Amino acid sequence: MDDQADAEMGEEAEMPEGEAPLEPPAPQPISDADPDYKVHTTEFDEEIPAEELAEPVELERLRAYLDQQLEPLKGAVSRLANKLQRRLQAQQNRSWEFDREEGILDAGRLARIVASPTTPLSFKVEKDTDFRDTVVTLLLDNSGSMRGRPISIAAICADVMARTLERCDVKVEILGFTTKAWKGGQSREKWLAEGRVATPGRLNDLRHIIYKSADAPWRRTRPNLGLMMKEGLLKENIDGEALEWAHRRMVMRPEQRKVLMVISDGAPVDDSTLSVNPANYLEKHLRDVIAMVEKRKAVELVAIGIGHDVTRYYQRAVTITDAEQLAGAITEQLASLFDLKGANGPRMALRRTG
């Protein structure tokens, strides 16, 4: 009992009479890129694997539909993917460590042993190149304006890229972003119930979709890409927060080189948010996030615009105008992306297409 009484007295001594308790710490900003970027509530936001948004049977059916869309291009896409694979693998320049005690016998140094029989055998070991220590994230705009041919293009693009890069030992992550509802969803309902505070910031429920994590094999996640064909999935696009989410996921990865590729068809739009905030609210945040990612240089950022000029946002950008151009364009861009021949190591050499 005495010990308990002492403990209670100690607690009282720590809080002198008349002093107010300490204020709780200020909440962390929603965005690393802009501490003034506001979100009315994150309560209804969702980060979800694609397989949780549809039953397996439906995913297989949707994937079959996507394959149908791809059928006219399948031969050309496969040929270009194989060509890209050969080019990438040829760029994985071999380098060796010599004079090792074990490994592959170094035939080039056998002459030394003939000249001096007491010289021990020399072995060599192949060094891993940085090329393999790479992860690529593909961030897909899943907004309503992508419905129809553009979303098929994006899904096909993701499919070809994931298969080809996986064969070259490059990890690939495929993410998508949209909202759970039109017209603000539960976030707007909560805002209305709470008295319509002025300039509430982002006012819709985010839906961030993981189609393929970097460590998951393409074969296992293949049906997930069919989800993009699902009626009612594609809604609003809040690009800045999606880009920041993808960037956060990437910087936690162990790979030395990180490439983040965004595929989009327009500027960020969310009617609920823009109706109660400045007209450029979401676009400004996207520009701020891009500036942060490009400044930090932990991740190489590149954008592909589908019928949309993304060069006004991103330093490294390319425009694709139609699916028929997609296979050739993406082959060239990926080959440039992984061009290891430059004096300064890996570099990007993107050009605008279309």
Indicate residue ranges for each PLM-predicted region.
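Acidic, glycine-rich A-domain
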Residues: 3-354
